[in-house]
Every structure is written in structure tokens, then in C-alpha cells.
Amino acid sequence: MQVYAVGGAIRDELLGKPSQDRDYVVVGATPAEMEAAGYRPVGKDFPVFLHPRTQEEYALARTERKTAMGYKGFAFYCEPDVTLEDDLVRRDLTINAMARAVDADGNLTGPVIDPHGGQRDLAARLFRHVSDAFAEDPVRILRLARFAARFHDFNVAAETMRLMREMVAAGEVDALVPERVWQELARGLMEARPSRMFEVLRECGALARLLPELERLWGVPQRADFHPEVDTGVHVMMVIDCAAALGAPLPVRFAALVHDLGKGTTPEDVLPRHIGHELRSVRLLEEVCARLRVPNECRDLAVVVAREHGHIHRSLELGAAAVVRLLERCDALRKPARFAQALQACEADKRGRKGFEHSDYPQAARLLAAREAAASVDAGAIARACADNVAQIKDRVHAARVEAVAQRLGAQPGE
């Protein structure tokens, strides 16, 4: 049998980038021979094995045949007569359809095997599908869009974009299961330029099918004095790219993505103002989270950011009492880490505007100081002092927090 490194490892080596992908294909072997060599079988749909020493995955070379709609509708053939070229032709993009032989010590040997022009397309910075079999798996649309967020100086070949549009029109995207959609979107959000993922999905028509709440933001105007970029869709893309530049974790990036969904449902007769968009955004993002089965950590932060980002932006103007009410609505005292993430999402929102990309965000430091002051109040001591009148506890604790915040911020308690 012969082992080859394939896909991302070869692509990244040619780009001079460190590789996170390390996939191996084994040609000329049977499952029994792999197990006899010490490999442990783990594949459910087709033969995949863990290396006995490195625990890396090794898959038998295979061909596949479409049997039904969706990304699970495939039959696989994994016999020893499947060649490396047979395996490479089933792959999605030319830049991922290259291989190099691997010796017994796991070292790459010999020339790059490139039957589909992957090196040419790397040089041209193009995403191009290997064959029309690309159309058989709708996940490939999401994967390509995710790659666009990573390799953001690449473009999609015209014939590949045309094929993706045909797939969307044929309803292939509608057959995707929610968990897989979320998995790919989440991975794309964590890339260097997440906006590119959504631009590609929008261009091929998939965004309107998967996230219509986001798609409808393009073309919706905002007040130019607050948003020089005007277009709401453009603004949201700037916000998620700013969150990426800040090194934000996934919950922050997701909150940045969905914080303004309500602007897409603002009545036309009140545009470019968006009164009440915060609560509309909460309702819409909760629908998105339910549909895509978004993790609770991401959903809960997104709700706080969508509901409170306007108040957080204006917090420099708030007195101590209003600041404490804001902290309480955000549950900042019980969940300080989530509150810090909310502030980071709001910073991305404030900076995600044309001409404001490098502006400061003093609101974050002020609110973190206020949270620290409010948290210093000994609520237990107040509760014990009010043992004979427990109805007063909540108001007394609140008043003490207002006083503590006022002292820290140099503001009047009643402001």
C-alpha cells in the first residue's frame, strides 16, 4: 500500500503557510490490512483509521456516487483498485486536490501530484471546482465560502460561481441539516476576514436561503451622520471583520453578525431611522438560533448585545443609577465574562463604520469600572441587616450599588 498526504496540507505548504489540515489517503489496502498494521477503525460511512502512534486519520482511497439530495446522499466505493487519481477527482476544489507521497516516517517525499491544476489556481488566487461532481454536495458551497474568509485575496472562478448558483436554484442548499450549516458558519466566522464568507454566499444566492434575516439588510439605509457607510449590510460586514481584528471569540463574532437584524424589518416610511430595531433584532436572532441550533453561549450573548448595544454606546452620558440598571439588565454582576464579551462586541459595532475603524471605545473601561464598584457591595451584609424587613433588601442593595458606582465614576447617584 502507498500513503499520500492530500488536500490542505499540500495547499498550505505551497502557500508557505502553517497547516492545520493533515489528511492522509491510503491506496491499495483493505480494511483488514489496515487493522493488521495496527490502525484502529473509526469511520462510520467509509473506512477511516487512526494511526497507531500519531492518532492521525488515514482514509482508504474512495470514489463516491450521488444517491439522494443533501450532503449525506452518497454511496462509497473503497476497494484496493481505487487509484489516487480516482480519489482526487472527487474532491471539491483544485487547490485541495493535490497530493504528495509519505514515507514510513511520515515525511513528504517526491513531487506534488497535481492532476487538476491546483498549483495554477493557487498562483492565480482562484477557487475552482475539480469537476461537476462539486454540485452533488451542497456543503461544498459553505466550505468554499469559508475558505474565502481564510484566503480572502482569492476569487471564485466564474464557472464555479455559476455552478453554485445552479445548485441553489435546484434546492440543494435547502437539504442541508441545521447542525452542518452552523458548523461551517461558525468556522468561517473564526477566520481572518469573515465578511468574505457572507459575500460569497450572497453572490451565489445561498445566503437568502440560509439566513434571509441577514440577506435583507443589504440596501437598507441608515443615518449617514452615524453610519457614513449607510448600507446596513455593509455595516454588519465591517463589524464582523472588526471583531475578527480584535481577536474576538466565536460568541462575540456571532453577536456582531446578528446584532442589527431588526433593521431589515424597519418600515420604509421611517427610514433611515430604526426606532425599536433592538427588540426586533432579539426576536429575529432567537428565530435564527432555534433554526440553526446555535449553542446557548452564542445565543445568550447575542441577545444581550442586540438588546443593549444602544444603551452601552450611550453609557458615557449615563449617571450612576442608569449605569447600575444597565449592569443589572446585562446580568453583569453574575456573569462578568459574558459582560466583557458584550463590551467587545459593542466596540466592534462602534468601530465597524466607515472612518471609525481605529477609534477608541472608552465606554468599555467605564462600564467595567462600574461593574467592579457595584460588585464590591456586600449584598449578604445588607440582607442580614434587613432580616426583619426582607422586602427592603432588593432596593437597599440597588441603592448601595448606585452609591458605589457614583463614587467610582465621579457621578451623582441620581443622574
UniProtKB/Swiss-Prot annotation:
CTP binds at G8, R11, R91, R143, R146. It holds the Pfam family PolyA_pol_RNAbd. InterPro entries: CCA_bact (IPR012006), HD/PDEase_dom (IPR003607), HD_domain (IPR006674), NT_sf (IPR043519), PolA_pol_head_dom (IPR002646), PolyA_RNA-bd (IPR032828), tRNA_CCA-adding_enzyme (IPR050124). Monomer. Can also form homodimers and oligomers. A single active site specifically recognizes both ATP and CTP and is responsible for their addition. Belongs to the tRNA nucleotidyltransferase/poly(A) polymerase family. Bacterial CCA-adding enzyme type 1 subfamily. This is Multifunctional CCA protein. It comes from Cupriavidus taiwanensis (strain DSM 17343 / BCRC 17206 / CCUG 44338 / CIP 107171 / LMG 19424 / R1).
